[in-house]
């Protein structure tokens, strides 16, 4: 359930964009009605409507995520606050300037923030964030923990670069598909490969 909860804004972004693509006139009318006051010039065109509506929904969904957790008196992870700040800034710029370039940078900025946090904590704070999250499930030598942490740094940097490559070398529709299925698929593959490599260190249930 937590996995689906975390993916909620991404899934809605994908669904609204696809709906907008298939219902261009309705999407343009809807965007003009609800977003015209937020865009520079006050006009939402047929070609712009799908990405602008999807971006607006992603911002709202992320705010609702945090609101739900706060209403249930649950802890809001720092990563979710970071995601909110980035989606509001880059998504807001996309809507105001009706320019999809900003929202296409959002995943890369988020990936690179994760990489920077992992690397900074290990080098300057002598704290391994991956170890903090995973040490209850497995016991690894210090050197292995460092390599696992650095492997995540490399993964996030690579994902950020890959996002930019797809975003600016393929159509927006292709990028939206990659954002959900490509990003999720590569994340799953990385986790599975890493889990297989580290399986010998898994703690036996008591």
UniProtKB/Swiss-Prot annotation:
Presence of the UniProt keyword Transmembrane in the record: yes
Membrane protein topology class: Multi-pass membrane protein
Keyword terms of this UniProt record: Cell inner membrane, Cell membrane, Membrane, Transmembrane, Transmembrane helix
Subcellular location: Cell inner membrane
Transferase recorded as keyword: no
Signal peptide: none
Superkingdom, natural source: Bacteria
Residues passing through the membrane, by range: 50-70, 78-98, 105-125, 150-170, 173-193
Database matches in InterPro entries: YciB (IPR006008)
GO cellular component: plasma membrane
Family: Belongs to the YciB family.
Protein purpose: Plays a role in cell envelope biogenesis, maintenance of cell envelope integrity and membrane homeostasis.
PANTHER family per the UniProt record, alphabetical: INNER MEMBRANE-SPANNING PROTEIN YCIB (PTHR36917:SF1), INTRACELLULAR SEPTATION PROTEIN A-RELATED (PTHR36917)
HAMAP family with a match to the protein in the record: YciB (MF_00189)
Entry protein name: Inner membrane-spanning protein YciB
UniProt source species: Herminiimonas arsenicoxydans
Gene: yciB
């Amino acid at each position: 359930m937590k996995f689906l909860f975390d993916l909620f804004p991404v899934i809605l972004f994908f669904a609204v964009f696809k709906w907008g693509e298939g219902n261009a006139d309705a999407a343009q009318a809807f965007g003009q009605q609800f977003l015209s006051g937020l865009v520079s010039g006050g006009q939402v065109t047929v070609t712009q409507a799908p990405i602008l509506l999807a971006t607006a929904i992603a911002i709202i969904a992320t705010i609702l995520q945090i609101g739900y957790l706060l209403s249930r008196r649950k802890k809001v992870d720092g990563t979710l606050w970071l995601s909110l700040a980035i989606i509001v800034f880059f998504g807001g710029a996309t809507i105001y300037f009706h320019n999809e370039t900003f929202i296409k940078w959002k995943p890369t900025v988020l990936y690179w923030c994760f990489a920077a946090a992992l690397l900074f904590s290990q080098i300057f704070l002598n704290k391994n964030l991956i170890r903090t999250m995973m040490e209850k499930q497995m016991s690894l030598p210090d050197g292995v923990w460092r390599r696992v942490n650095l492997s995540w740094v490399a993964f996030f940097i690579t994902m950020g670069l890959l996002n930019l490559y797809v975003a600016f070398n393929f159509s927006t529709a292709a990028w939206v598909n990659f954002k959900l299925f490509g990003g999720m698929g590569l994340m799953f593959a990385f986790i599975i490969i890493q889990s297989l490599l580290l399986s010998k260190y898994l703690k036996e249930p008591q």
